[in-house]
């Protein structure tokens, strides 16, 4: 419902009753009126028969169909989105479809049969076979399919007419809306990228226009004020000029009237009455002249003022037009200059701000870099201090371990020499009980003392070898500790907690390593002492047995042992001491050869004596060979 100017405010249709009970209640309300009771109506509804309920159901269905048609008509004619918010939109039903042709009917009926016959073939080949069979069918069978098609087609036409009458226009509108929406979406997608770039330029241009409009408004207001002031001045000037012109003309007219009056008075007056006539004429002429001049001056001044005002108005209008045009041009020039100045000033401000921001960013970045360098330097100096402290600690620990190893080696050598002397005294005391073997062993006794002296020299050499081996193990331990330190530094960068744990672990590792090294060195020194004691005993026995057979074998065996290379002065001292010890041992052996005899002892006793000697060496008893070994190390 549309008019020339406005649309009618059509209200949406109301929903009808949706149940049979509601339809029954409406009928009773219309019939009973004021005497309506809910309880009685409910009882009557429960007593209704099936036929009456079917009648009410038909009423409900018809009411729903009418409501849908009215609502659809309302939605097609209404305008404005605000009203469509509370109105539910009715969906347009689909078009009625055309029926299937005769060939497709034949396919629907016989497709399964052909598929069961030809299982190995594809669908395309099966369709070819069916089309050939359909073309070969007789006309009677083909007419059956065509008649069914024509009946359904007649029904289709009737349904399509009904649908087109109700929903044809709405369906066309929806199709056009969909097409427009798709085209708009494509255009928006294509222009989306350009709109982003144009939006920025539009925003800047709109700002410039606003600035120019503000400046133009100010200039127009100032020009209008100037025009008002100039018009008021022109009006005042015209009034003052008209007054001046009237005054000057009045004076001229008065002078001419005086002359005329004087000449006329001379002609008319006689000689007798010259004085009286002249005085009277003067007074009358002056009064008349004044009156006539004032009246004439006023008329002339009014007419002239009108003409002058018109001419001045024309001139002023033309001058105003010229001024307005010039002022408009000047305003435009001023606006353009103000725009240029503003744009240049805004650009300069923006550029200055951007430069200030860049400078501030550069300053902050420099400050951050300086702080980072300071932190790095402080961290590197701290790491260097820590590494120097650790190296000092490790050197102190190594010196302590060296001292402990030297002490343990010296004690072991001294305990070995004393244990040998005690074992020899015990063996001599037992030699008196044994008879036959004493003579043979007494003969080999002086050489056993020499062998002991030679073994003592070998002990010193072995102790020096142990010292060299300990130095090698220490260097390896240092290398391992350095590797551990490097690994700890790399791990310390990962986390502060890892640093603390790594430091504690390195300290515990260094302590455990130093303790384990000291233990190993002590155990090595103990083993060396026991091995030397066993070797001396075995060598003394072998010498006593092989004295008669090969006296030079022992000397060859002794020469096989490699001694460490030392200085010539140390060698001479050792040789002199060994020779003096041999001489003393030979003298003692000659004096005691008859009384003292060596006896064979079990290995278990020897081991027990060795253990006693080790204990005494730990207690701190030192000998000559032990002091010498410590000096060399």
Curated annotation (Swiss-Prot):
Stretches for region Disordered: 170-633
Keyword Repeat: yes
Residue ranges the UniProt entry marks as DNA-binding: 12-74, 96-164
Low complexity: bias regions: 212-224, 253-271, 406-416
Localization per Swiss-Prot or TrEMBL: Nucleus; Chromosome
Compositional bias ranges of the Basic and acidic residues kind: 353-374, 382-401, 478-491, 540-550, 559-612
Disulfide bonds: none
Biased composition (Basic residues): 174-190, 272-309, 330-352, 417-444, 496-524
Molecular-function GO term, any one: DNA binding
Predominant place of localization: nucleus
InterPro entries: HMG_box_dom (IPR009071), HMG_box_dom_sf (IPR036910), UBF1 (IPR051762)
Keywords from the named record: Chromosome, DNA-binding, Nucleus, Phosphoprotein, Repeat
Post-translational modifications reported in the UniProt record: All four histones are processed from the precursor molecule. Phosphorylated in growing and dividing cells but not in nongrowing (starved) cells.
GO cellular component: chromosome; nucleus
Compositionally skewed regions (Polar residues) per UniProt: 446-469
Record has Phosphoprotein as a keyword: yes
Coiled coil, from the record: none
Name the UniProt record assigns to this protein: Micronuclear linker histone polyprotein
Species: Tetrahymena thermophila (strain SB210)
């Amino acid at each position: 419902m549309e008019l020339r100017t406005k649309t009618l405010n059509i209200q949406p249709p109301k929903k009808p009753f949706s149940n049979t009970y509601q339809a029954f209640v409406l009928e009773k309300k219309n019939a009973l009126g004021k005497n309506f009771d809910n309880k009685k109506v409910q009882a009557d509804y429960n007593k209704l028969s099936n036929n009456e309920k079917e009648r009410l159901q038909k009423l409900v269905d018809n009411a729903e169909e009418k409501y849908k048609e009215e609502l659809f008509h309302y939605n097609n004619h209404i305008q404005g989105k605000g009203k469509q918010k509370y109105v539910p939109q009715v969906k347009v039903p689909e078009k009625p479809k055309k029926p299937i042709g005769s060939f497709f009917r034949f396919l629907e009926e016989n497709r399964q049969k052909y598929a069961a016959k030809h299982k190995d073939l594809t669908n395309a080949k099966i369709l070819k076979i069916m089309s050939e069979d359909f073309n070969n069918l007789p006309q009677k069978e083909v007419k059956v399919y065509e008649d069914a098609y024509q009946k359904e087609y007649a029904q289709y036409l009737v349904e399509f007419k009904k649908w087109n009458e109700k929903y044809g226009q709405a369906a066309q509108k929806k199709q056009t809306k969909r097409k427009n929406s798709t085209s708009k979406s494509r255009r928006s997608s294509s222009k989306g990228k350009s709109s982003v770039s144009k939006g920025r330029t539009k925003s800047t241009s709109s700002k410039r226009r606003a600035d120019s409009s503000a400046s133009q408004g100010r200039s127009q207001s100032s020009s209008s004020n100037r025009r008002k002031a100039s018009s008021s001045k022109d009006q005042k000037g015209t009034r003052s000029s008209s007054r001046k012109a009237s005054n000057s003309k009045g004076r001229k007219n008065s002078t001419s009237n005086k002359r005329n009056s004087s000449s006329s008075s001379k002609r008319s007056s006689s000689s007798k009455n010259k004085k009286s006539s002249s005085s009277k004429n003067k007074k009358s002429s002056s009064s008349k002249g004044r009156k006539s001049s004032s009246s004439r001056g006023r008329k002339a001044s009014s007419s002239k003022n009108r003409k002058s005002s018109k001419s001045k108005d024309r001139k002023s209008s033309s001058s105003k037009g010229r001024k307005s045009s010039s002022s408009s041009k000047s305003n435009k020039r001023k606006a353009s200059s103000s725009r240029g100045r503003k744009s240049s000033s805004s650009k300069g401000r923006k550029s200055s701000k951007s430069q200030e921001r860049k400078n501030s960013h550069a300053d902050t970045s420099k400050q951050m870099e300086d702080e980072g360098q300071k932190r790095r330097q402080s961290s590197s100096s701290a790491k260097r201090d820590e590494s120097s402290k650790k190296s000092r600690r490790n050197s102190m620990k190594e010196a302590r371990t060296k001292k402990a190893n030297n002490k343990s080696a010296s004690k072991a050598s001294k305990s070995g020499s004393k244990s040998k002397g005690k074992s020899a005294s015990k063996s001599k005391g037992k030699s008196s009980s044994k008879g036959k073997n004493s003579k043979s062993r007494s003969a080999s006794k002086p050489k056993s003392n020499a062998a002991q002296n030679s073994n003592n020299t070998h002990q010193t050499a072995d102790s020096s070898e142990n010292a060299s081996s300990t130095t090698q193990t220490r260097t390896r331990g240092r290398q391992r500790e350095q590797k551990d330190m490097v690994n700890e530094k790399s791990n310390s960068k990962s986390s502060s907690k890892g640093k603390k744990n790594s430091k504690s672990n390195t300290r515990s590792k260094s302590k455990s390593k130093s303790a384990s090294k000291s233990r190993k060195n002590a155990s090595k020194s103990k083993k060396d002492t026991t091995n030397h004691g066993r070797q001396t005993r075995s060598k003394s026995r072998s010498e006593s047995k092989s004295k008669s057979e090969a006296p030079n074998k022992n000397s060859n065996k002794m020469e096989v042992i490699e001694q460490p290379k030392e200085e010539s002065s140390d060698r001479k001292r050792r040789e002199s001491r060994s020779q003096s010890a041999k001489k003393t041992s030979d003298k003692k052996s000659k004096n005691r050869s008859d009384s003292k005899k060596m006896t064979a002892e079990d290995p278990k006793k020897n081991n027990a004596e060795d253990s006693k000697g080790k204990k005494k060496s730990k207690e701190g008893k030192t000998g000559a060979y032990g002091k010498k070994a410590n000096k060399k190390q």
